[in-house]
Structures are given as structure tokens and as C-alpha cells.
Regions:
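Metalloprotease/metallohydrolase-associated module, dominated by Zn2+-dependent proteases
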Residues: 2-7, 11-17, 35-38, 48-81, ...
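Short Cys/His-rich micro-motifs in 6-15 aa windows
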Residues: 23-33, 82-91
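Fold-level signature of zinc-dependent metallopeptidase catalytic domains
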Residues: 88-89, 93-104
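Hydrophobic (often cysteine-bearing) scaffold residues that line and stabilize catalytic clefts
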Residues: 103, 107, 188, 192, ...
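Auxiliary, metal-adjacent structural segments of Zn-dependent hydrolase domains
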Residues: 103-174
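Short, glycine/acidic-rich hinge or "gate" loops at secondary-structure transitions
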Residues: 126-128, 212-223
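Short pre-active-site segment immediately N-terminal to the catalytic Zn-binding motif
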Residues: 174-195
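Catalytic Zn2+-binding segment of zinc metalloproteases
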Residues: 199-216
Length: 285
């Protein structure tokens, strides 16, 4: 992730809400893709330090402190472009969930920053209720508890369906995610990695499905009409293809053409963000 510069010329970072040098309130302006210093007006609105544009804080900024994005002052929606994509948020009656939700939101905003920079369409379910992009952060339902052992009644599977990306809240818990990373032999099982991968499925539906690109896709990635369920069962029973290192970008990519696309998409976004960071710090290769 690139860094930004405060009005006082101090370096500020994507998730910052206050400049530690001059104490200026900070807010991210999605339409400008800039984190900037703000001044508060007598009416309780926020003005960008470099112009007269007026904004209000996202509700999840001032109410929950899990966001730092701004909303145009005359926008009837109290949520920013990122938070209004949420379909389900965690149960905040559990105090520990607030920090896990913060981690989810941080990764989601990092993904959206890249998608906006690439000029990719981000259409919410407020606009397209059945196919728009949305996010649900869900917990496993615990049926019973015996000492340190938990009985899971309903396990939340991270995935994508018709624009809705569901993420298991446990993925924001480092210890649980790392345990699963080792168990599943997934080197890039990270929170931002999940967002990038699942967004790949959304953009397959948005850009490839039923378009002129479907045949070039099949030529490069394979025929997606192959049974996904059978491919999934075969992958977990027998493991990846023997020669996957020579053909696919990851073991999981060898499972089915849809996963090959999503893994390739995610790794492309990995590289885009890595190169942007390197360029920001003037690192040459």
C-alpha cells in the first residue's frame, strides 16, 4: 500500500485517522483516492484542507471507529462507499468481534482501493440487489461448549455467490487462520488474500460470463462447465495435479477453471499492490 502526505508534510498511512505530527483529523476521499487532512466546520462537517469540498464521516468512522472513509456532505447515505457494501456485519454484542470486524474492514478497503485504481466496476447490492457486490462477515454457530472444546453447529464457509462474498470471521483471528493455512497447505492464506480471491469470482461473473471473452477464457483456463462439485471432491480426496507447479499459479488453482481464474486474479492484485508499494518507496528491481 502506498503512503500519503499530510498538510504538514508528515507521512500518513492508509488506515490512519489522525496525523501524529500535527494532530490533524484524517479522512480518505474515495473519489480522489487520497487520504487527507480535514478541518471541522461550525456545522460539524469536514472540509478538505486543500479545497472547499465538504464531507461527513462514515457512520462506521464516528460510531464504531472501524473506518476512516468520508462521505460527501449531501449524500443521503450515512455509510461510505466501502461500508455500504456490507450485507451482514458481526454481532457487536460480543466485545471481541469489534477488533475482528476492524481487520475485515481494513482488508476490504485495501481491496477497494486497488479496484478503484484499476477502474473496475464496483456495483453495490443497493443498485443491483441480486448480483451486486456485497460482503457478509459471519461467525460459526456454536452449539455447545465442553471445557476448551467447542461443538460447531453451523460452519461458515468463505466463498462467493452471485456477487455476495461471505467471509468467516475467524479468518480475522491470526491463530485460527495460520492453523488453517498449515492444514490446507495454502501459502497465501491471508485476510487480504481472501478478499482478492473472492473478488475474482465476482469479476468473472461481471466481466467474463456470457461475454465475448468466454471462449478465450476457456482456451486459457479450461472449460468452467466441468462439474465444480466433482472437481472439489476430487481435489480434497486426491490432492492437486502432480504437475501443478508447471501449469498453475497455486495448487488450489488446479482444482477447477473458476479457481484457476480466481487464484490468478488474486496473485495479479498481489503483484499490483506490491509494485505500487515498491514504487512509493523508490525501490527498483
Amino acid at each position: 500500500m502506498k503512503t500519503f502526505t499530510c498538510q504538514c508534510n508528515h507521512t500518513i498511512h492508509f488506515t490512519n485517522t489522525k496525523c501524529i505530527a500535527c494532530n490533524a483529523i484524517l479522512g480518505f476521499i474515495p473519489e480522489d483516492l487520497q487520504l487527507t487532512a480535514l478541518t471541522i466546520t461550525n456545522e460539524g462537517l469536514y472540509k478538505v484542507a486543500t479545497n472547499d469540498n465538504l464531507y461527513k464521516q462514515c457512520k462506521n468512522y464516528w460510531h464504531h471507529d472501524v473506518c476512516n472513509w468520508m462521505v460527501p456532505h449531501d449524500d443521503p447515505n450515512d455509510l461510505c462507499q466501502s461500508c455500504r457494501l456490507n450485507v451482514t456485519i458481526p454481532n457487536l454484542e460480543k466485545p471481541e468481534n469489534l477488533n475482528l470486524w476492524y481487520r475485515m474492514e481494513t482488508s476490504k478497503r485495501a481491496l477497494l482501493f486497488t479496484l478503484f485504481k484499476l477502474n473496475l466496476p464496483v456495483i453495490s447490492r443497493l443498485v443491483e440487489p441480486k448480483t451486486g457486490l456485497g460482503f457478509s462477515f459471519l461467525e460459526d454457530q456454536i452449539e455447545d461448549e465442553y471445557g476448551n472444546e467447542l461443538t460447531v453447529k453451523n460452519y461458515v464457509v468463505t466463498g462467493h455467490s452471485a456477487g455476495l462474498i461471505t467471509l468467516n470471521l475467524n479468518e480475522a483471528l491470526d491463530s485460527t487462520r495460520i492453523e488453517m493455512r498449515e492444514k490446507m497447505n495454502e501459502r497465501y492464506r491471508t485476510l487480504i488474500g481472501h478478499f482478492r480471491h473472492e473478488s475474482g469470482h465476482y469479476y468473472w461473473d461481471r466481466l467474463i460470463k456470457n461475454s465475448s471473452l468466454i471462449e478465450p477464457f476457456r482456451k486459457l483456463f479450461g472449460d468452467e462447465r466441468l462439474s465444480y462439485t466433482q472437481s472439489l471432491e476430487q481435489y480434497y480426496q486426491n490432492g492437486p495435479a502432480d504437475n501443478w507447479q508447471n501449469v498453475w499459479i497455486s495448487a488450489y488453482a488446479s482444482m477447477h477453471p473458476w479457481e484457476d481464474w480466481a487464484e490468478t486474479w488474486a496473485h495479479y492484485l498481489h503483484m499490483v499492490d506490491t509494485l505500487e508499494t515498491a514504487n512509493n518507496y523508490e525501490i527498483s528491481i
